[in-house]
UniProtKB/Swiss-Prot annotation:
It comes from Carboxydothermus hydrogenoformans (strain ATCC BAA-161 / DSM 6008 / Z-2901). The gene is ruvB. Belongs to the RuvB family. Residues 182-252 are annotated as: Small ATPAse domain (RuvB-S). The keyword DNA repair applies. This is Holliday junction branch migration complex subunit RuvB. It comes from the Bacteria. Mg(2+) binds at T66.
Length: 339
């Protein structure tokens, strides 16, 4: 899959984004309810001199789950170890990390829904009893050895909470969903990032970037950098409405943040399948893309803005999408054909 500017997933170019990330809860913009709840539990844990309870963060990619995990560790004044579900292939991989944690440290596992089952089962006793059960030997003579672990905090992150098993999900004391950001919140993030990048930006320029950022801070910061490049080369270096609009139009990111692939999906559904209902497999085949990629990368935002609907018979393009694309809406097709 090619790297998309408007993808919420981390791209190669985002590796240098750490300088823009907030380090304290007071600097973290948005997610007010989540932030307030976590702040209370952090203070309570510090007062009791205990490890924070385990935390599960879920929601679309790019909303700040990794950033929030790092902030939690900073607020607790402890170290954080960052890994991911796919990186923990064997129980030994997890054991090596757990045995090197300090008291009250944070272990952050991104994409926790992709943990191999055998590794997940080792995690149960670690989360609940702060212990590792290790099997010594094989066959009838095998015996179990319990190894004590420091009391740590596990923070799991996932974009697909529904794929977590019940035993794992039930072991998290705190479960928080991160929501898409408002345009106003994204403007605050863009203005903060512009200041850190030493780039001058007008309110109109900030608004233009924010409204095309799909409610996602990671995308907002990515687009800000691209618009900054355009402003420095084609203008005075100040990001205003004119050069923000010109830069984003050049990148083919429209007023709502849709890119060419988003529009291709919608037009394919309209032109080849009369707006639906159409199965996800048919859409994937028509645009030569994987089903999982469409479900994980493209579809969530189109659902969020109401451009497509999921129905028992398949996906349907709504009138909103027709209007946005400038295509005449056929009342005998699409969503109305369901009835």
């Amino acid at each position: 899959m090619e790297e998309r500017l408007v993808s919420g997933y981390e791209l190669t170019e985002d590796e240098n984004e750490f300088s823009l990330r907030p380090r304290r809860l007071s600097e973290y913009i948005g997610q007010q309810k989540v932030k307030e709840t976590i702040s209370i539990f952090i203070e309570a844990a510090k007062k009791r001199n205990e490890a924070l309870d385990h935390v599960l963060l879920f929601g679309p990619p790019g909303l700040g789950k990794t950033t929030l995990a790092t902030i939690i560790a900073n607020e607790l004044g402890v170290d954080i170890k960052i890994t991911s579900g796919p990186a923990l292939e064997r129980p030994g991989d997890l054991a090596a990390i757990l045995t090197n944690l300090g008291e009250k440290d944070v272990l952050f596992i991104d994409e926790i829904h992709r943990l191999p089952r055998i590794v997940e089962e080792v995690l149960y006793s670690a989360m609940e009893d702060f212990a590792l059960d290790i099997m010594l030997g094989k066959g009838p003579g095998a015996r179990s050895l319990r190894l004590s672990l420091p009391k740590f905090t596990l923070i799991g992150a996932t974009t697909r909470a529904g794929l977590l098993t019940s035993p794992l999900r039930d072991r998290f004391g705190m479960v928080h969903r991160l929501e898409f950001y408002s345009v106003e919140e994204l403007m605050l993030i863009i203005n903060r990032s512009a200041a850190l990048l030493k780039t001058e930006i007008t309110p109109e320029g900030s608004f233009e970037i924010a409204k095309r950022s799909r409610g996602t801070p990671r995308i907002a910061n990515r687009l800000l950098k691209r618009v900054r490049d355009y402003a420095e080369v084609r203008s005075s270096g100040v990001i205003n409405l004119e050069n923000a609009k010109a830069a984003l139009d050049l990148l083919e990111i429209d007023e709502l943040g849709l890119d060419p692939t988003d529009r291709l999906i919608l037009k394919t559904m309209i032109e080849k399948y009369q707006g639906g209902p159409v199965g996800i497999e048919a859409i994937a085949a028509a645009i030569s893309e994987e089903v999982d990629t469409i479900e994980d990368v493209y579809e969530p935002f189109l659902l969020q803005i109401g451009f497509i609907k999921r129905t028992p018979r398949g996906r349907v393009v709504t009138k909103l999408a027709y209007d946005h694309l400038g295509i005449a809406y056929n009342k005998n097709a699409g969503e109305l054909s369901l009835w």
